[in-house]
Amino acid sequence: MSYLPRLDGVHHLKLPVTDLDRSLAWYRSRFGYEIDIEFVERGVPMGYALAHPSGGPVLALRLDPDRARAAAGFDYFAIGVPDKQAIEDLAAHLTTLGDSHAGVHEATIGWILPGLHDPDGHEIRFYTTQPLPPR
């Protein structure tokens, strides 16, 4: 390839949802996301861009019930957390809120917390950005 485009990370993640208010409340209470931008079409809220206080990935929620139902169950992305302690703390927080998940496991290059599902059934995974120690 003679031309290599300059890329600069992931701009945002977008999920289709069936109920904006329910999804907003869930992402706020689980992870601390807050509204950065509200997308209004013909006077109707159709989506939100959510920001995280620690600078985690921007998450966009888009009202699109048909796509939300079709996408349920798939893990589109993994959100990074700094280290094993942070992912264990997150798992404990989710458990306290009554959320089902698969627990923290050692994975190929770090620690993973899979099996968490948002109100529309999207699997939200977390992976440590700190790799496992060398063996």
List where the protein language model places each region.
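Vicinal oxygen chelate
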Residues: 1-6, 9-18, 38, 48-49, 68-135
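Short amphipathic beta-strand starts and helix->beta connectors
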Residues: 59-64, 99
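Core segments of cupin and vicinal oxygen chelate
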Residues: 16-58
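Acetyl-CoA-dependent GNAT
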Residues: 62-67, 128-131
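Conserved N-terminal glycine/acidic-rich loop preference
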Residues: 1-7, 14, 46-48, 61
